[in-house]
Design a protein with these regions (language model features):
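Conserved N-terminal catalytic/coupling substructures associated with nucleotide/phosphate chemistry
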Residues: 1-221, 226-328
Length: 328
């Protein structure tokens, strides 16, 4: 009787979506016990009587809005990631076939394979996940890598740059830019912008004939960190840009979306995960990423060698921020 009552929890409508569970009877030290095995939901968040409950240590409580977002992202990670989902309303005409053929395809596929295969360009685009199917809509990655107007379809897919003469956001703004276009264009423009804003001091050590150039920030560290922000940010459900704020004493880079998948605040340097795996793949194909999982390590190394303080990270459920302190 008790076993039937427990099994009936699955169907009483209080838990939605209905849980997948097994209820079994076992005997332990002469007494009958019921063992309930509940399997993780593939479509979180799960609600009980309209509420989402989470466990934080020994406490069980109702999830906040930010915690609900994190649970929803787990659902996405179990299905197609956003960057491979179709952009509804967009068509093949919204992708630049010239950009794809000349700026991506030769780097993604070996030349002899391109020469020998008989695929149409649309079949090639589908194979490389720029289209959902040869006559279907483009994917988010296709729009971001080779779209004619990516910000029309994904409004937050740009970088907001501010150069501030002071330590507070309310201080005078020396320069401001919105870095738009496809992601490869953004990354190239950001490289140039970083080089223009780095200050280089000259030191002449005793008994040496050559000057030593010491930048206030190492270029490679900033390059890796802004690339990480663009690669790992959340594009869906937000119109927030990547924020690249250059203060007089520090740089702040903030992107939408908290840590994803198996990455946590304690293991993100050694156990990365990818919210946008096909965008990450595309950035690797085009040479913006040499190896996966080493961006933060490169930044750490460059900053240490240049004499900058260690990176400071802030992880929230809705955004991630890194602070790079100026060389003292």
């Amino acid at each position: 009787m008790l076993r039937d009552d427990l099994a009936g929890i699955r169907f009483d409508g209080n838990i939605l979506p209905p849980p997948v569970m097994n209820v079994q009877k076992h005997t332990f030290e002469g007494a009958d016990i019921a063992v309930i095995e509940v399997f993780p939901s593939k479509t979180p968040p799960v609600r009980y009587k309209g509420r989402i409950y989470i466990r934080t240590g020994p406490r069980c409580g109702i999830a906040t809005y930010e915690e609900e977002i994190r649970l929803s992202e787990k659902r996405i990670s179990g299905n197609l990631p956003f960057d491979t989902q179709p952009i509804l309303g967009a068509t093949i005409d919204d992708i630049s076939t010239d950009l794809f053929q000349n700026g991506y395809l030769p780097y993604a596929i070996a030349p002899e394979i391109i020469d020998n295969n008989q695929r149409t360009i649309f079949e090639q685009m589908t194979s490389l996940r720029f289209l959902t199917k040869s006559d279907g809509p483009p994917t988010a990655m296709g729009i971001l890598i080779a779209g004619k107007d990516p910000q029309y379809w994904i409004p937050g897919a740009y970088v907001q740059f501010l150069r501030i003469e002071g330590k507070e956001l309310t201080d005078a703004i020396k320069d401001q830019k919105e870095i738009r276009g496809i992601l490869p264009q953004q990354l190239r423009m950001l490289d140039e912008l970083i080089r223009l804003n780095i200050s280089v001091a000259l030191e002449i050590p005793d008994y040496q004939a050559t000057d030593i150039k010491i930048p206030d920030y190492p270029f490679k560290a900033l390059q890796q960190l802004i690339c990480n922000a663009i690669m790992h940010r959340r594009y869906e459900g937000t119109n927030a840009p990547v924020r690249f704020y250059w203060f007089s004493d520090r740089i702040e880079i903030q992107n939408a979306g908290g840590l994803y998948g198996q990455a946590t605040a304690s293991n993100f340097r050694t156990t990365p995960d990818y919210r946008n795996p096909t965008i990450a793949e595309a950035m690797k194909v085009m040479g913006f990423v040499q190896r996966f999982g080493v961006g933060i390590k490169i930044a750490d190394k460059e900053l240490a060698e240049n004499g900058n303080p260690p990176l400071e990270f802030q992880f929230e459920s809705t955004y991630t921020q890194v602070i790079i302190r100026k060389k003292i």
